[in-house]
Amino acid sequence: MNLKQELIERFTRYVKIDTQSNEDSHTVPTTPGQIEFGKLLVEELKEIGLTEVTMDDNGYVMATLPANTDKDVPVIGFLAHLDTATDFTGKNVKPQIHENFDGNAITLNEELNVVLTPEQFPELPSYKGHTIITTDGTTLLGADDKAGLTEIMVAMNYLIHNPQIKHGKIRVAFTPDEEIGRGPAHFDVEAFGASFAYTMDGGPLGGLEYESFNAAGAKLTFNGTNTHPGTAKNKMRNATKLAMEFNSYLPVEEAPEYTEGYEGFYHLLSLNGDVEQSKAYYIIRDFDRENFEARKHNVENIVKQMQEKYGRDAVVLEMNDQYYNMLEKIEPVREIVDIAYEAMKSLNIEPNIHPIRGGTDGSQLSYMGLPTPNIFTGGENYHGKFEYVSVDVMEKAVQVIIEIARRFEEQA
């Protein structure tokens, strides 16, 4: 079986396992599917020939590819996450393989009229000639991050079967609950034992990311007073209208749909409620730490103003930091970025360095003492029914993993 065939076989099998995380769950991991998937990977890592294969009580899978060199090479790690996003259903995924893709629109689901078009997704024609894997239009695909996970498995298998490629000790980890921000919560950095690592959790070809948002979450509870609308004058306080009022005080243009690059935002993720009580959940993002703190202060000030206007119980704020910009922790060990950059260039891949408008496990792990940049996996349009992945780009990602390992040994 060649690399491409192994990638397709593993990936299409892995995405059929429902591993969506669940923000409302307090178990670790938050869903049983992640445990099921982790157990499968433990067996397959052993079959490949890795050693020290473990899965702890929290669902974290770790394994070792022993060094095949006498050189003193730093221990490097490669990570991916077990769970898939909660934004769209991930149950009963039916991956569709399109070989030698013609670059034109693909009807994902004729019955539901779900069509993947170049008009909506202009990057689509650039994959002409590739083998791409799409959804059937009814679920997400789960390339985030089963593409990255598959690539690590295939790369480790390749290195075991090609001992002429010299490398130091490599550690592999698969983590649960990344999509809900809890990936590193129970990650044992000391047990992992790597000097630094790479998450395989990026997007299109060439992606190399070592800057992430500073991130916070804000949960607002608006408490109203419900009375009969016919006699409500000077009595009723509509909680949903309080939520609308709060949102109106935020800058309209500082939302995800109006921002790009290094611009931060406020994002209303959900709003549920009625006259008596409404709950709004926001995420707050910015690359610059000062701007990040200013955004949080703005939320606090709006809440304070509304409390003065309507009473302290009218608006209740719970706000917490989620992760910070990893750049601060990557800069002192910049060589790990340089080696990934050089690895890509040597494979005729043009590195595309840009800030992550999101977070990876690496954002938090970098602050836990494990500097962890992020590398592309080949996926597009994550978290929805138009998600797809190029197997040709997945193959390139496997080559990058192998080349990074080789270069660390060569330069030791």
UniProtKB/Swiss-Prot annotation:
Names of the cofactor(s): Zn(2+)
Chief localization: cytoplasm
InterPro entries noted in UniProt: ArgE/DapE_CS (IPR001261), Bact_exopeptidase_dim_dom (IPR036264), Peptidase_M20 (IPR002933), Peptidase_M20_dimer (IPR011650), Peptidase_M20B (IPR010161)
Sequence positions that bind Zn(2+) 1: 81, 144, 201
Gene Ontology CC terms, in alphabetical order: cytosol
Cited CDD domains: M20_peptT (cd03892)
A single BP term in Gene Ontology: proteolysis
Pfam families noted in UniProt: M20_dimer, Peptidase_M20
UniProt-recorded name of the protein: Peptidase T
Binding site for Zn(2+) 2: 144, 179, 383
Function: Cleaves the N-terminal amino acid of tripeptides.
GO terms of molecular function: metallopeptidase activity; tripeptide aminopeptidase activity; zinc ion binding
Entry superkingdom: Bacteria
EC annotation from Swiss-Prot or TrEMBL: 3.4.11.4
Localization per Swiss-Prot or TrEMBL: Cytoplasm
Coiled-coil region(s): none
Recorded family membership: Belongs to the peptidase M20B family.
Reaction(s) catalysed by this chain's protein: Release of the N-terminal residue from a tripeptide
